[in-house]
Amino acid sequence: MTVQQLSTTVIIIGAGPAGAGTSFFLTKYGIPHIVIEKETFPRDKVCGDACSGKTALVINRANPEWLAEILGDAQSFLPSWGITFVAPDGKSLDIPFTLARTQETPAPGFTVPRMVLDDFLFNKMPSPYCTIFQNATVSEIARVGDSVKVTMTHERAIYEVTASLIIGADGDKSMVRKQFSGLDTTPKTYAVGLRAYYEGVTGLSKDNFIELHFLPEMLPGYLWIFPLPNGMANVGVGILSEVVRKKKINLREQMLHAIKTNPQIAPRFANAKLNGKIQGWGLPLAMERQNLSGDNFILTGDAACLIDPFSGEGIGNALYSGMLAAMAIQHAVEQNDFSGAFLKSAYDDVVYKRLGDELRISAALQKLCKYQWLFNFVVKKARKSASLRNTISAMFSNIDLRDQLRRPSFYLKILFNR
């Protein structure tokens, strides 16, 4: 069989949010690239389906018309105005994402099935600068001199694609990471999650608040209930792999047990129906700084282990890291420098400058979650104090305020009502 030769500036492995985010901005910068995707869109992706304000920010920067399209499609995208924390003792706390809500203000976040979101993003990628191969199987990734070469099979044809740079946007089982980085996850930096779609869950917020239930048996993980369009809800659990292994937890049994027996949750599922199967996936958490690039390669999204350790949200950071990768690539192309040293400065350092504080705080909060008494204490105090609720709300947009959660002085102030 004849091997077809292709060359480009950048190869992107994976067409999910991280790959799409990279592609959008490479197109903006006029940089040719080839996207290689193993599946065919639309395709499902197991996920919590919640999108933070970071998702909206990147999409808006890519093209404001795309965000307007999302905000105007209530059948596919459900605006979310806040979050409900349920403490281990069952007490709940509603926290809006913003205190400055008006009729003209778009919701800071939204929920959407990943099949819908990823297909939306995928269909925005085609451009004169972007060539896409779907249903393509990569058999080899190698560095050849100052370039990278990817060998793939597509529609019974074999291709060798050569480029100056390769982007690993291929998820937590990334081939690019495995080949070039040596970056790997451990049970302490990896979580496992289950996702189920239910129809007919009652008691959902009229403002579509997402819910995090910190059940004692799941700490430092939680059970979530996220409202979706058309009366659906994404219901799931996420727990550190280390905890699952040590306690020999059966996630599926634990989730279903909570749905059937928990006094706050069970009545809401009395007439709910499971739609499809309960499915699992892995979450590589950003618990510590890692090397995100090297000679001729950059890792983005889950391949770069950039999932928020506290919230478990990865879509926003996937898109955001893709945008930052494209910015770094623009500089690399201008300087004709694709070395690890240059990319570390142009990409790694920028990622951690933009996201580092947020991720460090989230990692600390994730560790604090195992203290039931502390969680119960903060929720109890916040239920009685409007000013404390407002402070917690402001933490969603103010990283310095959020940092207070790591400090003992914050809890002393709550204790003495200061």
PLM features: what roles do these ranges have?
Residues 27-47:
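Glycine-rich FAD pyrophosphate-binding loop
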Residues 10-12, 33, 297:
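Conserved hydrophobic helix-helix packing surfaces used for dimerization/oligomerization
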Residues 243-328, 333-337:
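FAD/FMN-dependent oxidoreductases across multiple families
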